[in-house]
Design a protein with these regions (language model features):
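A short beta-strand-turn-helix
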Residues: 25-44
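Bacterial N-terminal signal peptides
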Residues: 7-15
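Thiol-/selenol-based redox modules, centered on thioredoxin-like
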Residues: 130-156
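Bacterial Sec-dependent signal peptides at the C-terminal "C-region" and cleavage site
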Residues: 14-24
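Thiol-based oxidoreductase modules, predominantly thioredoxin-like and allied folds used
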Residues: 75-87, 99-106
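Conserved helix-turn-beta segment immediately C-terminal to the redox Cys motif
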Residues: 43, 61-80
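Short, internal strand/loop/helix patches
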Residues: 95-125
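Conserved redox-active cysteine motifs that mediate thiol-disulfide chemistry
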Residues: 49-63
Length: 156
């Protein structure tokens, strides 16, 4: 190979690898189970059940991540979605969501944590839910209640 072509070939190979990694990045965020999604995070997990066609769910998902980041609590935020994989993939790409999402097509987590409607949040310590959204309380009240629960959990 000529000297001038070597850097071009190397750049093309690296670009191809980077492009391939970018395509697969969405796939790695879509998990088949809660265990897969929370792997490597020994602390509590905040499950955020959502739908891609629900603007309130979108707000709840991103506000949950913001709340955990702002409070600097060692909590993993994991989305839970039961709709079509293509809808989830498009959502993740459109909004650049980088945290894991469990694709729960059989609604195993929905049933386990008794989720009837979205948006809904549950804070898990191990497998026990120490916080569950109250569907009869508005979004602001639920946010404050979650914040109070996290504060009690970490600042005893």
């Amino acid at each position: 190979m000529k000297r001038g072509l070597l850097p071009i070939a190397l750049a093309a190979a690296l670009a191809g690898g980077a492009m391939g990694a970018g395509r697969d990045a969405v796939e790695t965020r879509i998990c088949a189970s809660l265990e897969e999604a929370s792997r490597g995070s020994p602390g509590p997990v905040l499950l955020v059940f959502f739908s891609t066609d629900c603007p309130i769910c979108y707000d709840d998902l991103f506000e949950s991540r913001y709340l955990v980041d702002k409070g600097r609590w060692p909590v993993s935020v994991v989305g839970v979605f039961s709709g079509p994989r293509d809808d989830l993939k498009a959502f993740l790409e459109k909004y650049a969501w980088t945290l894991p999402v469990v694709l729960d097509r059989r609604k195993v987590l929905f049933k386990k944590y008794k989720v009837d409607a979205v948006p809904f949040k549950a804070l898990l310590l191990g497998t026990e839910a120490v916080y569950r959204d109250d569907p009869y309380v508005g979004p602001d009240g639920r946010r404050e209640e979650l914040k109070r629960c996290l504060t009690q959990l970490f600042y005893r």
